[in-house]
Amino acid sequence: MKQKKSVKEEDKTPVVLVVDDNQENLELLQAYLEDVDCETVAAHDGLEALRIIERRAPDLILLDVMMPKMSGFEVCKKVKNDPQTSDVPIIMVTALNEFGDIERGIDSGTDDFISKPVNKLELLTRVKTMLKLKHLTDKLERTLAYLSEIEKQTQMAKSD
């Protein structure tokens, strides 16, 4: 179960899960992400990615599509259908760029696409944008929960 942070809790370094069965691609993406203030975690296939996500939901997932054991489409669908992880943004990083592939990715729940070969500036721009959106969304959720609690306390005080 996800633990809610308090409104005033200090922001922690975001975690980016990079999933690719090709070691060179994995290392390249991790090297590019050194320019972003984040911690990277690597997975070599979809099943390994799901095990990592189950232990600790990342703030962002960079997900290859064509992998053994479980495709990126399947991983994406599982992550997005789980209430504990449905808000984790996913960027599919793929050589597949036909309209049908993009449509399938959207149907599986992906938030964005980057085509291979990856352009470093494009990757960094999209990653930073997704992390910022995730940070602001999480902060908004904490603030709303905090305000809801204050409202409950106010209502209880009025009824006393």
Residue ranges and their predicted role:
Residues 8, 15, 23-41, 51, ...:
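Two-component/phosphorelay signaling modules centered on CheY-like receiver
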Residues 1-17, 147-150, 154, 158-160:
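Non-catalytic signal-transmission and effector/linker regions of two-component phosphorelay proteins
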Residues 118-127, 131, 135:
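C-terminal output helix
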Residues 56-62:
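Active-site beta3 strand of CheY-like receiver
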Residues 67, 79:
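Receiver (REC) domain active-site loop signature in two-component systems and cognate sites
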